Amino acid sequence: MDKRVYIFFTLFIVTIISHSQEKCDFDSFIKNEFPAKEKNFMEGKLNLKNINIGFIFFKPIRYLGFIDSKIKRRIDVKFLKISKSEINDSIYLAKGKTIVGKNTRLFEGKIQIRQIYSFKYISTGEEGEMDGIVKSQGIIIADYHFREDKKLSATGVFEGKVLLRWYINNKGVFSYDTINNFSDDYNNNQFIGTWTSYKTGVKKVANWGAHRIPCSGDLDIGAAEFMPNEKYYKYGWEDYKP
C-alpha cells in the first residue's frame, strides 16, 4: 500500500473513532452495554414503596469521572447523603461534593427513577456460586439534577441519566449488583450527563461511575481495570492509583 494512502486511511479511521466517542450519550451507552435489550429485558416490577435504593450510591469505594470530553479533566464525586422522598417513592434527595483540581464544591439535588427493567436470564457468578441465590436481577434508569452553590466560582448544574444494576436474593433482599465484578468491563452506577456553568452557560460533558467511566473514549486504556491514558495525565490523572 502507498505510504500516503496508508497515512490518510489511518487518520480517517482515527477521526471516525474520535467523532464517535464525542457522540457517545446515554442511549448509545445502553445499546452498547445491552445489545440484545429488547430480547433479554422485561419491564421490572420492583415495589418502590417497600425498597430504598439510597444505599446503592454509597456502595462504590470511589467514583471515577471526567468533565469536558475534549480534555477529560478528572473529577472526583462523593455522595454525602441520600434520602428517600416522603411524598414520592421514585424520588431521592441527594447531597454530595465534587473535587476538580484544587476546587471542592458541594451540590444538592434529586434523583428520580424513570424505568425499571428485569433480566430474563439472570447471572450466577463466575463459577455459578450465585445459582439459587439470585431471585431476580436488572437495572434502574433514573434522571439526576444536582445544583452547586451559585455564590462560589466555577460552579454550575450537573444533570443527566444514571444506570444502576441491582438484584434481589432468595430472601427478598434488594442488593447492589456485584455478581459480574469478575469481568474486566464490569461497571455500575454509571452517570452520563453534562455540567452547565452558572456564569457562562457553557455546557460540558460530565460522566462518572464505579469501576469504569461511561463514554470515556480513549481516556481508559486499561484491560482488567480502569487505567488513564498518559495523554491526559496533565488533567488530573497523573497521580491516579488503582
What are these regions (language model features)?
Residues 1-25:
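Bacterial Sec-dependent N-terminal signal peptides
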Residues 22-80, 94-98, 121, 128-154, ...:
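Tryptophan-anchored aromatic micro-motifs
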Residues 81, 98-100, 111-115:
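A mature extracytoplasmic/lumenal domain signature
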Residues 104-108, 156-157:
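Short, surface-exposed coil-to-beta transition loops
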Residues 111-115, 160-169:
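Extended lipid/amphipathic-ligand handling interfaces
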Residues 179-185:
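Exposed beta-sheet edge/beta-hairpin loop segments within beta-rich domains
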Residues 207-219:
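Short beta-strand elements
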